[in-house]
A protein has these predicted regions:
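Contiguous, glycine/small-aliphatic-enriched amphipathic segments in soluble metabolic enzymes
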Residues: 1-134, 173-198, 203
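Short clusters of hydrophobic/aromatic residues that line enzyme substrate/ligand-binding pockets
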Residues: 54, 138, 161
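Conserved beta-strand scaffold positions in the cores of enzyme catalytic domains, especially
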Residues: 73, 147-149, 158
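Short, acidic/small-residue loops that bind anionic groups at enzyme active sites
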Residues: 129-153
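Ligand-binding beta-strand-loop-alpha-helix segment within the catalytic cores
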Residues: 151-184, 189
Length: 206
């Protein structure tokens, strides 16, 4: 099966659109679908001197491996014009709309996984939308009780005992009960993953 990955472009004034376009310039053994502002992507495409062909994504189309210099896009326009490196709280809602749509696509099995470009937590909160990170946002949208973040680097996999917390709050948040919950989620998750780069480890260190 060829997986279809939905990629959020993140904060439009940041590096997110650039990362997505640079990714789309190469070939990949999966189908890529971007969620973001088509106008911003087109402007960054030109400014970076790339030649990525942007086209609207059609729901339900057959899955095919990504061809270099192409990018299907689900357009979510910005509220205000975007200037690179200049944050605008009026556009913060568009960032969260990307995540909401990407989550819906995965839950509907239209897409098989989500990749997220960087966001700016500060500007989202300044806009009056409480946001501590992707992990908590996705946990809330999917009614997930105990989300666990997993970092991978080759054969090494590191699960974090907390999500996004101030450092001062970390010690009191780690308890025998919370560790047991996280370890159970980790063990169950690793057993259910079929991709070769995330096979069940032969040892577990705590």
């Amino acid at each position: 099966m060829i997986p279809r990955l939905v990629i959020t472009t993140g904060e439009s004034a940041g590096i997110g659109p650039d990362i997505v376009l640079a990714t789309a310039a190469a070939s990949w053994p999966a189908q890529l679908v971007a969620v973001g502002c088509m106008e911003t992507l087109a402007a960054r495409n030109q400014a970076l001197g790339l030649n990525v062909s942007l086209a609207p994504y059609t729901s339900g189309q057959n899955t095919a491996e990504h061809r270099a210099n192409t990018l299907p896009v689900i357009n979510i326009p910005l509220n205000k014009p975007c200037t690179p490196a200049l944050l605008n709280p009026d556009n913060a809602g568009q960032v969260l709309a990307q995540l909401e749509l990407a989550t819906e696509l995965c839950r509907a099995q239209e897409c098989h996984a989500m990749v997220t470009a960087p966001v700016h937590k500060g500007i989202i909160n300044t806009a009056g939308m409480p946001f501590s990170g992707h992990t908590e946002f996705l946990a809330n949208k999917t009614s997930t009780d105990a989300p666990v973040m997993l970092l991978t680097a080759g054969a090494l996999k590191v699960a974090l005992a907390t999500t996004h917390l101030p450092l001062s709050a970390v010690p009191e948040s780690i308890t025998p009960h919370s560790l047991e919950k996280s370890l159970r989620v980790l063990a169950g998750g690793l057993k259910s993953v079929s991709y070769t780069h995330l096979t069940l480890p032969t040892s577990l260190a705590v």
